[in-house]
Structure formats: C-alpha cells, structure tokens
C-alpha cells in the first residue's frame, strides 16, 4: 500500500512483513547538512565496549557513533533537541509521529527512540535476527539511509522473512554460542525461506515492528569505497 505524505514524501506499508517505508524524508538541503555533520562524528567498531552477539564474528563489525535520543530512553548521550544537524532528522520524524505511532500501535506520547549513525563497508552485513531489548522488549526498529547514492549491485539490502521458525537451535549448531539470548537466528531456523527485501535507497526511512526476522545483506565488492551509511535505532 502506498499513500501520499506531506512535503512530497510517500509512505509504503506491509502488514504481512511488518514494515513501513517513508521515502524522501528530508529535503535535499537538509539531508546534505545531516550527511556532512554525521560523517564528521566520532565512529567506533561495534563491540568495542561490550559484546552485542547479534554481530557474528564472521559478518564484520560495523562502525557506529554514540547514541542520541528522542524522549526519555534511559540511554547515554544527548537528547533532542541536540542543537546539531541531527535535529533535522528528529524534527522530520516528529512531523510524521502520528503515522509512525499508528503503525507501531503506540500512542504518540509513547514514541521514544535511540539512534546512532552506522557505516558498513564492502563485506560487512548483519545476520538473521530479531531485535530484542535489554530487560524490556523494543517497540520497533528503524533505519534511515543517509548515503548520497546507491547502485543496485552494491548490496546492503534489508532482508525480511515472515517468522516461520519452528525448531530450536540444535546442540551442534555452529551459531548456538552466538544465538542464546540475543535474538540471532541461523538460516537453519527458517523453514519456508520466502521473504522480501528493501533497497537502501538514499533518503529512505524503514520502520520495522517488533519480532520481525531480518538481516542486512553484506555490502558487495562492487561498492568499492562506497559505504552503506545510515541512521539506525530502536523504539523503546
């Protein structure tokens, strides 16, 4: 389903796969300002300070910034307004908070989230998993693609499957050590194996409902020095 949205943005939504897409989230000038600012932020490797087991050792470790929050999330880092170009993103989400809250089945006052910038170079991806929170479940997740351009053969697609896992991890599963308590699932847990994908189109916001089984396809060698650049985070 596709509907019109203010400021030339469009919304696509799938109940079957649990996603919402908002294209053209920011104006061209605002996206460029945010891109320039975020690229100058400080990045570090995922798992530099604590082990997030969703990041399998063979999938590569993305680079990310420190977190920023909208609302009281209990997370460290600045909270909106941050007096930086990150506020362009926060404000754009705030303008569409009614549609987002409705999709996540929340009241508008319940929409709180934490966000960080992520960089994936060629060869880096993220294995199949569902997002789970610390001590409490996430209310949803999102990714906003911030790179200037992206070609179809460069990989980095968001892959989504219906939740068709019926078997527990076997004791001899190579992924068992990384799967326990993390939301990480090996391909052997997927029975039907039919899903959908979303291209990392620039200026596109993708929102996922909780318990959506998904992965990030590794960025292809054809991308060269072009990195998959996004803002991503969780509704809490």
Could you tell me what each predicted segment is?
Residues 2-101, 157:
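Non-heme Fe(II)/2-oxoglutarate
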């Amino acid at each position: 389903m596709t509907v019109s949205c203010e400021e030339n943005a469009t919304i696509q939504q799938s109940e079957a796969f649990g996603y919402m897409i908002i294209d053209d989230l920011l104006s061209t000038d605002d996206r460029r300002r945010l891109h320039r600012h975020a690229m100058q932020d400080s990045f570090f490797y995922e798992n530099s300070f604590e082990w997030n087991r969703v990041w399998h050792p063979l999938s590569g470790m993305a680079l990310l910034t420190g977190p920023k929050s909208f609302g009281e999330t209990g997370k460290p880092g600045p909270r909106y307004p941050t007096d930086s170009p990150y506020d362009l993103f926060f404000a754009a989400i705030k303008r569409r908070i009614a549609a987002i809250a409705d999709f996540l089945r929340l009241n508008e006052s319940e929409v709180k989230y934490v966000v960080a910038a992520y960089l994936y170079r060629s060869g880096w991806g993220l294995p199949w998993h569902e997002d789970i929170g610390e001590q409490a479940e996430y209310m949803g997740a999102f990714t906003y693609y911030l790179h200037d351009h992206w070609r179809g053969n460069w990989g980095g697609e968001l892959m989504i499957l219906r939740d068709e896992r019926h078997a527990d991890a076997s004791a001899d599963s190579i992924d068992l050590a990384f799967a326990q308590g993390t939301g990480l699932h090996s391909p052997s847990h997927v029975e039907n194996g039919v899903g959908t994908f979303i291209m990392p189109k620039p200026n596109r916001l993708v929102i996922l409902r909780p318990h959506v089984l998904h992965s990030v396809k590794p960025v292809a060698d054809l991308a060269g020095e072009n990195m998959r650049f996004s803002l991503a985070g969780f509704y809490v």
